[in-house]
């Protein structure tokens, strides 16, 4: 039996980002967005539009690449969870003009919180990097706060955990879903076919 699939359109994602941006501005106010590629890139860019305050500069977006999912060896476009997280791209703190993360509110963005393994890894490594930079710069007294935004959170047992403060205060999700395949428009090879599935689902999806 095929797994249940939930199809979401670009409009769906846009609206979820807009709704959550209000909550993020009320409680977190990020200085920097870090998008986990590739699923976090589009949500991060949409989110930045709604987080921009009038008269202020755009919030900078930095990118990291992590791989946990592996493509199935078949004609299917679906992916299955891998066994470990692998870095494919990371922040270079030595790069000229690199955004300073010490003492900032940093919002990590991804498309889905599935097993939570990727988010846990990203948060742990970024916390470690910021702590090292704070020590080098003699700024260990400055508090750096992390938040997380995901378009979807799958309601299921997780393989890893996040800091309690983040879960209680700074964890934002556009929608909670059951444990099923989530079909995003940026993964579609035929966007018209994808949108037809979205239309057929109507209000059935969360």
Curated annotation (Swiss-Prot):
It is found in: Endoplasmic reticulum. The keyword Nucleotide-binding applies. The active site is at residue 114. Its EC number is 2.4.2.8. Pfam families: Pribosyltran. GO terms for molecular function: guanine phosphoribosyltransferase activity; hypoxanthine phosphoribosyltransferase activity; metal ion binding; nucleotide binding; pentosyltransferase activity; xanthine phosphoribosyltransferase activity. Belongs to the purine/pyrimidine phosphoribosyltransferase family. This is Hypoxanthine-guanine phosphoribosyltransferase. It comes from Schizosaccharomyces pombe (strain 972 / ATCC 24843) (Fission yeast).
């Amino acid at each position: 039996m095929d797994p249940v699939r939930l199809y979401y359109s670009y409009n769906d994602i846009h609206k979820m980002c807009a709704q959550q941006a209000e909550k993020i501005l009320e409680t977190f106010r990020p200085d920097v967005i870090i998008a986990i590629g590739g699923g976090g890139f589009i949500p991060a860019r949409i989110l930045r539009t709604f987080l921009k305050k009038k008269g202020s500069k755009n919030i900078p977006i930095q990118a990291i690449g992590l791989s946990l999912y592996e493509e199935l060896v078949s004609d299917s476009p679906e992916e299955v969870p891998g066994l470990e997280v692998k870095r494919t791209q990371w922040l270079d703190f030595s790069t000229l003009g690199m955004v300073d993360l010490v003492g900032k509110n940093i919002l990590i963005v991804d498309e889905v919180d599935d097993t939570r393994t990727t988010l846990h890894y990203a948060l742990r490594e970024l916390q470690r990097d910021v702590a090292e930079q704070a020590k080098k710069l003699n700024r260990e007294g400055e508090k750096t706060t992390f938040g997380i935004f995901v378009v979807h959170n799958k309601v299921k047992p997780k393989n890893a955990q996040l800091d309690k403060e983040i879960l209680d205060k700074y964890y934002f999700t556009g929608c909670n879903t059951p444990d099923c395949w989530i079909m995003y428009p940026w993964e579609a090879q035929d966007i018209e076919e994808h949108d037809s599935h979205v239309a057929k689902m109507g209000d059935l999806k969360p």
